[in-house]
């Protein structure tokens, strides 16, 4: 990166060391202890930037249990970094610290598949992306152009389950920005980078039956399994090339 004779350099070794350290921490979305450790590590790492670093509490989220009752679902804190908030031009950079692998999942360790390929939980999705983001910003801050651009960084803790505890925060930070960049790898099979993603919606449906004797008075019963199977088939039939419907837990 060059600007007016100044160059920002990127230390590949430091990037790799951070990815290995971060990926050694289990950050399944429900692992609050692991997420707390990861958030602290990220806060320390992003403190090298000339801005403020804050851990923001998650918004409350209500989930539905199998019996239809509602309960509060806890989440980890989100990392927010603000650099030059008064700048006329500002952008948003986003990522997530959680992974799909819970604390009791067998995939917990990193392995070098060859001299250039590291396999481990969160290495690609997306602790590697967070390292790319951080070191790109560090290099940018070493250029003369940095003073003319402000930015916010958001690393949320609940992306893998739909970002319900961070959606309002994302919207608030995105307001007024010139652009928003997300550092999760999203390449097509031919290597083409995805430039947009479809939205998602999640719904919980509870089926409640009524018991009856299968031989004596079946007409008085209501079979919740049959009702669920019927709805699943009807929902799946609504799919189009633009809409994917996934009836699953």
Residue ranges and their predicted role:
Residues 69-72, 193-197:
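Short Gly/Pro-enriched turn/cap motifs at secondary-structure boundaries
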Residues 20, 43, 131-134, 138, ...:
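Predominant activation on well-ordered alpha-helical scaffold segments within soluble catalytic domains
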Residues 126-196, 244-247:
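Acidic/histidine-rich catalytic neighborhood of metal-dependent amide-processing enzymes
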Residues 97-100, 106, 186-187, 197-200:
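Short glycine-enriched loops at secondary-structure junctions
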Residues 26, 93-96, 133, 153, ...:
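Buried hydrophobic positions in well-ordered alpha/beta secondary-structure cores of metabolic enzymes
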Residues 98, 116-131, 213:
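Glycine/serine-rich anion-binding loops at beta->alpha junctions
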Residues 2-119, 142:
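Acidic/His- and Gly-rich active-site-bordering loop/insert found
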Residues 195, 217-249:
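Acidic-enriched catalytic cores of C-N bond-cleaving enzymes acting on peptides and small amides
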């Amino acid at each position: 990166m060059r600007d007016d004779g100044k160059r920002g350099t990127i230390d590949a070794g430091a990037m790799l060391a951070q990815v290995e350290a971060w990926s050694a921490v289990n950050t399944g979305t429900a692992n609050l202890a692991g997420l707390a450790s990861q958030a602290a590590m990220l806060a320390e790492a992003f403190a090298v930037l000339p801005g403020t670093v804050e851990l923001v509490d998650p918004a409350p989220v209500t989930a539905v249990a199998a019996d239809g009752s509602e309960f509060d679902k806890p989440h980890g804190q989100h990392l927010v970094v603000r650099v030059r908030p008064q700048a006329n031009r500002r952008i948003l950079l986003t990522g997530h610290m959680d992974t799909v692998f819970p604390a009791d999942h067998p995939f917990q360790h990193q392995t070098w598949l060859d001299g250039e390929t590291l396999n481990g939980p969160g290495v690609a999705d997306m602790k590697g992306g967070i390292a790319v983001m951080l070191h790109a910003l560090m290099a940018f801050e070493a250029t003369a152009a940095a003073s003319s651009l402000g930015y916010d960084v958001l690393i949320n803790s609940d992306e893998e389950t739909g970002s319900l505890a961070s959606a309002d925060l994302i919207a608030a930070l995105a307001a007024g920005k010139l652009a928003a960049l997300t550092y999760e790898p999203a390449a097509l099979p031919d290597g083409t980078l995805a430039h947009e993603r479809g939205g998602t919606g999640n719904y919980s449906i509870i089926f409640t039956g009524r018991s009856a004797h299968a031989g004596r008075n079946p007409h008085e019963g209501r079979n919740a399994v049959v009702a669920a199977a019927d709805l699943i088939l009807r929902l799946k039939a609504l799919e189009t090339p633009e809409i994917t419907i996934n009836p699953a837990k």
